[in-house]
From Swiss-Prot:
GO CC list: membrane
Record-listed E.C. numbers: 3.5.1.n3
Pfam families: Polysacc_deac_1 (PF01522)
Alphabetized SUPFAM superfamilies for the sequence: Glycoside hydrolase/deacetylase
Protein name in UniProt: Probable 4-deoxy-4-formamido-L-arabinose-phosphoundecaprenol deformylase ArnD
Pathway assignment: Glycolipid biosynthesis; 4-amino-4-deoxy-alpha-L-arabinose undecaprenyl phosphate biosynthesis; 4-amino-4-deoxy-alpha-L-arabinose undecaprenyl phosphate from UDP-4-deoxy-4-formamido-beta-L-arabinose and undecaprenyl phosphate: step 2/2; Bacterial outer membrane biogenesis; lipopolysaccharide biosynthesis
Coiled-coil region(s): none
GO biological process, one term: lipid A biosynthetic process
Signal peptide: none
Gene3D superfamilies: Glycoside hydrolase/deacetylase
Xref: InterPro entries: ArnD, Glyco_hydro/deAcase_b/a-brl, NODB_dom, Polysacc_deacetylase_ArnD
PANTHER family, per database record: 4-DEOXY-4-FORMAMIDO-L-ARABINOSE-PHOSPHOUNDECAPRENOL DEFORMYLASE ARND-RELATED, GLYCOSYL TRANSFERASE-RELATED
Residue ranges of every copy of the NodB homology domain listed in the record: 2-260
């Protein structure tokens, strides 16, 4: 039996309003629990359109057929008009998710984090995280114990900033296995649970065709030598490609693959490492990558 951490990122208003309820129903039918990370501020995701001037981002949008994948309401949110508030406007949905799944913070403002956090000072970052945690805790009525940086935009600055909140774990980077990042003080920090597997939009039209994706992904899972963690998005697998996701769950069960919340992947003893800026194929811009202590 192969155990895979299932992480669900919720980036937008429509992903929360439409995608999350569908995913909750799907997961319930398959008796699966996951870790769901919510963005809670007004939805400004459409402001990413300026990135179309970057060839790598433009190619990603074209090969993944972004207009049909996400919808124009997502692609234009927060551009010509004020974005819709996500968190409190969808409080009932978020509370329902928290009844059955592990719920954590993705971001206060997903667009702002992904576009600007790399240039923030530490206090600005702490204030932004605190605002998001406070809002999410108001909604679910209980402490938030985990987080996952939007767009995997994380480095040592993010690691240090999140220490102020004493979370159980963070999932801020890409890598191979859970670890504890070394702090500036030399002490180990809050556990990190990296995502190890590519997302749909990173590989469709580049490495694999849509109709072949499930088999391709399961092959990657079964060959994974670390601790497999897979990320889906409420805007993709909860909307346009929910049927593909259902087919994946059915095929995974047949092949002895089970899914679980990320916290179930933690152990008392974890290796030490760092989160450094790096790049991966299929994703524009830098993102946090796991580096095992002593490696270069």
């Amino acid at each position: 039996m192969t155990k895979v951490g299932l992480r669900i990122d919720v980036d937008t208003f429509r992903g929360t309003r439409e995608g999350v309820p569908r995913l909750l129903e799907i997961l319930s039918k398959h008796n699966i629990q996951a870790s769901i990370f919510f963005s809670v501020s007004p939805d400004n995701m459409g402001r990413h359109l300026w990135r179309l001037v970057k060839p790598q981002f433009l190619w990603k949008m074209l090969r993944s057929n972004a207009a049909s994948l996400y919808g124009w309401d997502i692609l234009l949110a927060g551009t010509a008009w004020l974005g819709k508030e996500i968190g409190h406007a969808n409080a009932d949905i978020i509370r329902e998710a928290a009844k059955h799944h592990e719920v954590g913070l993705h971001a206060w403002d997903h667009h702002a984090w992904q576009a600007r956090s790399g240039n923030w000072d530490r206090q600005t970052m702490i204030d932004d995280i605190a605002r998001g945690l406070r809002t999410l805790e108001e909604i679910i009525g209980q402490p938030v114990t985990c987080s996952a940086a939007a767009g995997w935009r994380a480095d040592q600055q993010v690691i240090e900033a999140k220490e102020a909140f004493h979370l159980r774990y963070n999932s801020d980077c890409r890598g191979a296995m859970p670890f504890r990042p070394l702090l500036e003080s030399g002490n180990p920090g809050t556990a990190q649970i990296p995502v190890t597997l590519p997302t749909w939009d990173e590989v469709i039209g580049r490495d694999v065709k849509a109709e072949d994706f499930n088999g391709w992904l399961l092959n990657r899972i079964l060959r994974d030598k670390g601790t497999p963690v897979y990320t889906i998005h409420a805007e993709v697998e909860g909307c346009a490609y929910q049927h593909n996701f259902v087919a994946l769950l059915k095929r995974a069960a047949q092949e002895g693959v089970t899914f679980c919340p990320l916290s179930e992947l933690l152990s008392e003893t974890l290796p030490l490492g760092q989160v450094v800026r790096g790049n991966i194929a299929g994703r524009e811009g830098w993102l946090g990558c796991q580096q095992i202590a002593g490696s270069r």
